[in-house]
Amino acid sequence: MSALECKELYFLLDSAGAMSAYQEKDASWAGLLAFSSEDRARDFCSESGAQAREIVALPTSDRASVAALIRQVKARAIRYLLLDLDYRRGRCIQVEFEGDDFGEAKERQFVPPAAR
């Protein structure tokens, strides 16, 4: 599923209101965690132990807000979105940022925690 196929994207906020990102060890860039449903976001929190204080939704049809979000996270060395990261299996969809919009989406496989 591409981020553009979702009507809304759900993001995890920490206690300071910052969005959660994932960065692999020794990687230069990080990925912004996003989910296609609130249930998937809650599942990730349960499986990973993430201390998300809040789950917020952003309609993908709100192009101005999507563009503003992408510009904001790029300033924090975040270069792509990780959609529906399955913490146990390490699978997700990586959606590249192209300018201030969503670009190419491709399947991504991380090393799951159990295999480390």
Kindly label every feature range from the protein language model.
Residues M1-R116:
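Conserved NAD+-utilizing ADP-ribose enzyme module
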